[in-house]
């Protein structure tokens, strides 16, 4: 016989819900550990009174009845385990595993039998159903009725609220059967009543969740939170764990109680009670027990009078009454010298405490993570430029908890702690293959041809060439633009009306005023607009003839291996993919080229073609009017078009400058120069009739030039098509 049996996927019944966990059976005890809450229940071998097997839906299970009258039910065993389990129970606990027969006739009348803390409703010798009395929260009697109310489990999708029993009156009975039924139920029911004297009372205790100040009254089986608005009664057996944690500034203490089931405030459930204490607050309480009761009932763990800081006194009383040890922060010490690591969880800031067997976060919302729940941890966003990092915890059920904004100084301490606890870190360099299976993961491979990328590069080169041509035009037209030479700082500072003076002086009639100045301003604005439009048109015209003329004698460029292969397989691609678009052939060919393993034939041919190109280029001499000459000639012609005339340069050598709109013919230039030499005048005269005629002639000649350019470009396109 084996010393123990262990099952990893067994369900235990907890208030109408089957909770999964691990069951271990040894000669000394039966241990069940809840997977979700981590709560451990132990049944000593000496306390076992009866063990039966029972059929459940789709499986079978065990009924373990203790001498104290408590019933435990475990389900999820395979049929093949029945014989093996029966032999182990007989050898370890000296019990015969007899099957419990159930009545399935559907009758709703029978006999109520009380066995320990279980109400069994039987018909003849078979059980119809069983009610654990520890699940009963209230029992109310009527004339011939008894109503049982039950504690609710939030994890249960459907719960039993109440059950009514009709008990017929018996005249010959000495006792009323209704009262007797009520007494049997109440003797074993988990009814919370605040009758009797409390063991200890703590006044005005600050609680962070649920927020408020409450008076805490501690009784033997439960404790009560009494606030201004809400009142809670919490059974001692619903407390899973106790935590005593110091605040980061060491001026406060957190006392945390983990609850299952949680308390409810409206629709909000609180799985943790977070109490906040000041370390310097002290109290003294006297327990209402004699020395003999303290020694017999609590094994001498409590004294008659307890004094000290409030959190220590409450923690000591809770620890003994609940029967759970208090968990501290452990050996971890952070950069701040305390066990707390400042961080943010979800939308609120709080503190993360690395414990000996898990993590706990306080306080909004509180969260406890056990090591056995953790799949991996990750240090995220911890680059050199950032001053903080994120700590991600991934659970085995797929849930990810992210603690963000942790100071960079905590990284080394936290990493050493993770290494010491042997937790799996997911970003150590081995797991950086996140994009391996993505289709676009190898798109940056320069050895593979990409038709779309080549087209984009060609367009970018053409655009750069056009931009260079445009920039040279703009630079050449703006060579004479010297605004600082046209203004007089002294005149602007000391003249009362600089613009009106200059306008009056330049007016031939000599009758300038406010209205005349406004008109001239409008004329100048319109002239500036015309100038901008003209520049824009000139830029468009200069871009058109930028096309290069091909040199027919220039050697043909070398063809790549991909293009050689594509030219040979183009027809086969069309046959295999009927109806394929011309634009899709290159894309399909690129995919086939990537899958092609043996490319040596095409690569050798491409190498020969490349050598041929280099040899021909060595002996090649450009023809007159070829690419290089055309290119230079095109740019020089553009510069000649926009090059300023000598008369303009002579005009700009004075105290001010003149733009194109104000340049007149030779007759008016001398008069303008004389006027420019006068120190009080800063702006030139409006354009004369001669200027207008000159502009008209120039504008008529420009369309002719553009037509010639367009004809030349059309001829180039025809040459390219013929090639």
UniProtKB/Swiss-Prot annotation:
GO terms for cellular component: cytosol; FACT complex; nucleolus; nucleus. Keywords: Chromosome, DNA damage, DNA repair, DNA replication, DNA-binding, Nucleus, Phosphoprotein, RNA-binding, Transcription, Transcription regulation. Residues 555-621 bind DNA. Residues 459-564, 586-723 are annotated as: Disordered. Residues 531-557 have a biased composition (Basic residues). InterPro entries: HMG_box_dom (IPR009071), HMG_box_dom_sf (IPR036910), PH-like_dom_sf (IPR011993), RTT106/SPT16-like_middle_dom (IPR013719), RTT106/SSRP1_HistChap/FACT (IPR050454), SSRP1-like_PH1 (IPR048993), SSRP1/POB3 (IPR000969), SSRP1/POB3_N (IPR035417). The modification Phosphothreonine is found at residue 669. Residues 464-478, 486-507, 664-676, 702-723 have a biased composition (Acidic residues). Residues 586-621, 677-692 have a biased composition (Basic and acidic residues). Expressed at highest levels in nurse cells of the ovary. Belongs to the SSRP1 family. PANTHER family: FACT COMPLEX SUBUNIT SSRP1. This is FACT complex subunit Ssrp1. It comes from Drosophila melanogaster (Fruit fly).
